[in-house]
Amino acid sequence: IWDNISELNKKFESGNAEAESGYTEIYLDNLHLVIKKINEATVQYYGRYGFDPAKIVPSSKKNPQKMWEQLLIIINEIKNKELHKLILLIYKSDKKKILIHPASIKSSYNYRSGFLEQVLTMAQIAKKLVPFYKVDRELVIAGVLLIKIGVLKEINSGYITDYSKKGKLLGQSVIARDILNDAAKKVRNFPTDLKIKLEHLILSYENNFQPNTSYKPSFPEALLVHYIYKMNSNIRLMETIIADDGDENEFTGLHNHFRLPILKV
């Protein structure tokens, strides 16, 4: 196979999954794999041989198709016609990507189908919390569904995740706002005031109320969306830190996102 390197370089890109056939042999007292044939591995052609992308990279433990169906139920509960059309348009237009996309590279839900798991979890949390407050239920639900939508274009969803050019230069909140605005143009008579509120939810959800920062959550729904996101992300991060800690000590080490020893029991 080393005789065909120039041709193979044209055939593959970094991060492609490969299907190989060949045999092993002993060379200089070491076992070597001699590859006779190599192709890009796809489910379409190699699924019958057991190829499954979810077995190659870290993936959600939940079934993506079932999560998608659960999410559609929540979206279809939105009674505001324009808002329902907007959310459905955004999600259905990117369904294929949403089913597999991670929610981040190094933070919470940083695995295959992580984005879908994250937004579904936040929507389920929102449904439970909304009855306790005098807030617009549908605005909160729409908020948790839209605040992370920019990650679909911020990072790549292949076997090796990395930031896209747009992700590096703009960031996912700006990208999410663009996605919102593009979709709103396709919904006839979409309310201007509602769009402005949705934009604010997207731009303010990560703000930690630090001095001299812009776009702080400035109405009750924005504040609730902010805390739903923060609570869910931080708890998942803490769970991951505990699960990944290999020591038998009662506490984890200090070198983690929270910079503190976390009780594991």
Task: Locate predicted features.
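Short, basic/aromatic beta-hairpin or loop at an interaction surface
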Residues: 1
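OB-fold single-stranded nucleic acid-binding module
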Residues: 4-52
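Conserved NTP-handling cores and scaffolds of large molecular machines
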Residues: 22, 42, 78, 94, ...
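Acidic/His-rich, divalent-metal-binding segments that scaffold phosphate/diphosphate chemistry
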Residues: 46-167
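Divalent metal-dependent catalytic cores for phosphoryl transfer on phosphate-bearing substrates
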Residues: 107-111, 117, 128-245
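N-terminal intrinsically disordered, cationic/polar leader segments
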Residues: 226, 253-256, 263-265
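ATP/Mg2+ or Mg2+-diphosphate-binding catalytic cores
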Residues: 244-252
